[in-house]
Amino acid sequence: MTVAADALSAPLRAGAEALGLDLSEAHLGQLLEFLALLQKWNQVYNLTAVRDPQEMLTHHLLDSLAAVAPLQRHLRGMQDLPGSAGDGAKLRLLDVGSGGGLPGVVFAICCPALDVSCVDTVAKKAAFIQQAAVSLRLRNLRGIHARVENLAGPFDVVSCRAFASLPDFVAWSQAAIAANGVWLAMKGRDPSDEITGLPPIAEVFHVEQLAVPGLDAERCIVWMRPRKGAEAGADGVGGPALP
């Protein structure tokens, strides 16, 4: 472990505890390894504009960890839901525009029973995800170099963080979401204007406020689901309509 990682261990542990996360030593170690890997690759591939390790911890790692408990809560209720991609099997998450693996890699570390695919249109970013999967020994993680519009599902959760407007996010990923799946969009301020502009194929069922340890900024998750009775195709979502 690098000196920088040693210095970040205590604030990472404290931040995870503040978020109510019961992470094992192995998970904490993987998160620190991921942060070190992100720093290393960022020197060459410009994965993120944030360079300072402490800022990376707060603005990226803890920011992503803030969504883990809400995600885990939803996964518990989805495992045996008819029409889900899981339906008794491993649930699947697609992280759109994953960039440097945020939050996709964090989700894969903290939710080992979840199958995580990170898609990005930039080849070097997808390659970084693949390297992270190998380096961190994450069999439930893979990077995909593609446009999300070209991916077929079904995925139980389709997530994004600082990716695009909600209407574009929903429109581009609609073919990938399971009939009883959810969209998890990590946002800053409550995006009321974007919510108003959502296409009829999706409905918001919860805007969940987040508090990120050490970060004085507004954060929230906009939870959405396919609207009941929506049809597949250009004006609907992939998969069968909800019952």
From Swiss-Prot:
Reactions it catalyzes: guanosine(527) in 16S rRNA + S-adenosyl-L-methionine = N(7)-methylguanosine(527) in 16S rRNA + S-adenosyl-L-homocysteine
A UniProt-annotated Pfam family: GidB
Subcellular location per the Swiss-Prot or TrEMBL entry: Cytoplasm
Keyword Nucleotide-binding (UniProt): no
EC supergroup of this enzyme: transferase
SUPFAM superfamilies the record matches: S-adenosyl-L-methionine-dependent methyltransferases
EC number assigned by the record: 2.1.1.170
InterPro entries associated with the record: rRNA_ssu_MeTfrase_G, SAM-dependent_MTases_sf
Keywords assigned by UniProt, alphabetized: Cytoplasm, Methyltransferase, rRNA processing, S-adenosyl-L-methionine, Transferase
Residues where S-adenosyl-L-methionine binds: 97, 102, 148-149, 161
Entries under Gene3D superfamilies matching the protein: Vaccinia Virus protein VP39 (3.40.50.150)
Role of this protein: Specifically methylates the N7 position of guanine in position 527 of 16S rRNA.
Xref: HAMAP family: 16SrRNA_methyltr_G
Name of the molecule in the record: Ribosomal RNA small subunit methyltransferase G
Upper taxonomic lineage: Bacteria, Pseudomonadati, Pseudomonadota, Betaproteobacteria, Burkholderiales
